[in-house]
């Protein structure tokens, strides 16, 4: 007789292989400061029981130039690829740029006793999202199985196969354009103030195109890069720090505001305008609002 091993015949493995190469450069020439960075990466995730591993590759860079500790410019980029997308749409290029001006290093503000630090800054860039969830390889057509139907003289149940979600050979990266404008300031060397305004336009969001593909076509509709969402708002923070004898203290607070709106969602045509999700916030709940109960037949007859 042998011993029963509850784990016999059962195994699970997950291997994550990540490779990264990095090159940095930083040098100052008098009043000129130059720095740069280049990076390449490759990620592979293999899970037991899955025939196809997950692959992501990319490279990126950052280049910065500063003049006399007053003017700053920076350019960054990413060139990334994901196996989630078909050949020809697998890679995306995502650049960004920013500028800054430290006004208190100018001669007319250098020794100001009230405004001891002021930096104005702005940035604009494009980012991409490959973590889309759902089905992998939505650009490839596949078949599902399920259900049975009687076949033959014996009416034996035969398993059925049917066409799965329609392939989308044009699926690609979701993208976001980001604009940020703000400043950092210090008053009397004690009060720090930071302000940021942001405007983010998301495009090519994966959504089901109910408007362009009606239900009567007879197949399960694929997700397509049709959605558009806008997010904008501001953030204001302040921090006051001081010292009384040997006692250090600070007071900090902030105000935030953000608003998002669905600009386009390819939703089906509705009978009434209030039924559309477009123009409202993301994931906003919808429902009918009751105005009361009927009291009697006369109340029913008088209702609109």
Language-model regions: role of each:
Residues 294-298:
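Extended, highly charged linker/hinge segments and catalytic-adjacent loops that couple domains
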Residues 288-292:
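Intrinsically disordered, low-complexity terminal/linker regions enriched in Pro/Ser/Gly
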Residues 299-304:
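Short, intrinsically disordered, charge-balanced linker/junction segments flanking boundaries
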Residues 1-287:
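Extracellular/periplasmic, surface-exposed regions of secreted and cell-surface proteins
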């Amino acid at each position: 007789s042998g011993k029963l091993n509850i784990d016999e015949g059962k195994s699970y493995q997950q291997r994550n292989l990540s490779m990264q190469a990095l090159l940095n450069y930083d040098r100052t020439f008098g009043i000129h400061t130059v720095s740069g960075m280049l990076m390449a990466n490759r990620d592979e995730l293999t899970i037991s029981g899955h025939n196809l591993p997950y692959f992501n590759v990319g490279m990126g860079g950052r280049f910065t130039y500063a003049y006399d500790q007053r003017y700053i410019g920076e350019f960054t980029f990413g060139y990334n690829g994901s196996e989630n997308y078909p050949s020809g749409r697998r890679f995306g290029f995502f650049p960004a740029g920013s500028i800054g001006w430290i006004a208190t290093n100018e001669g007319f503000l250098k020794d100001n006793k009230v405004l001891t630090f002021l930096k104005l800054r702005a940035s604009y860039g494009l980012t991409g999202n490959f973590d889309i969830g759902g089905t992998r390889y939505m650009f490839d057509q596949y078949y599902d199985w399920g259900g049975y139907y009687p076949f033959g003289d014996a009416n034996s149940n035969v398993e059925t196969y049917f066409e799965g979600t329609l392939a989308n050979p044009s699926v690609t990266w979701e993208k976001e354009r980001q604009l940020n404008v703000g400043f950092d300031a210090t008053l009397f060397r004690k009060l720090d103030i930071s302000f940021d305004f942001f405007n983010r336009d998301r495009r090519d969001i994966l959504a089901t195109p109910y408007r362009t593909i009606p239900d009567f076509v007879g197949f399960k509709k694929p997700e397509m890069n049709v959605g558009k969402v806008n997010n904008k708002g501001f953030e204001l923070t302040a921090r006051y720090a001081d010292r009384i004898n040997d006692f250090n203290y600070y007071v900090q607070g902030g105000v935030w505001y953000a608003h998002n709106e669905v600009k386009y969602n390819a939703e089906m045509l509705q009978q009434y305008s209030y039924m559309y999700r477009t123009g409202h916030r993301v994931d906003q709940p919808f429902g009918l609002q009751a105005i009361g109960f009927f009291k009697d037949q006369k109340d029913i007859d008088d209702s609109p």
